[in-house]
Amino acid sequence: MKIWLDGGLQDIDSARVSVLDHGLTVGDGVFETAKTVAGRPFALTRHLDRLARSARGLGLPEPDLDEVRRACSAVVEANPVALGRLRITYTGGVSPLGSDRGDHGPTLV
């Protein structure tokens, strides 16, 4: 199985998110789950609009929705199934312990 992590497809067995990612340490992140049918995410535009709105609500940097679309397409193409789920996770990224965000930038899975 392949996943998207910060700019490219990776094998699920080797992909790693830092334990210092703010999505893990303080819940600083948002996610969407889209149904996929015949290799296409259902209502992807609505899901991405909600992802961006939720990110703004947390004060996260605006997600690059073109990159998110490319990621979704790449993951669906790399993992062909007739019916599936596509989980999009966007976090504050690697940051120091505590509530301040670091300079590393957001994480996209």
Segments and roles (model prediction):
Residues M1-V109:
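Conserved alpha/beta cores of soluble small-molecule-handling proteins
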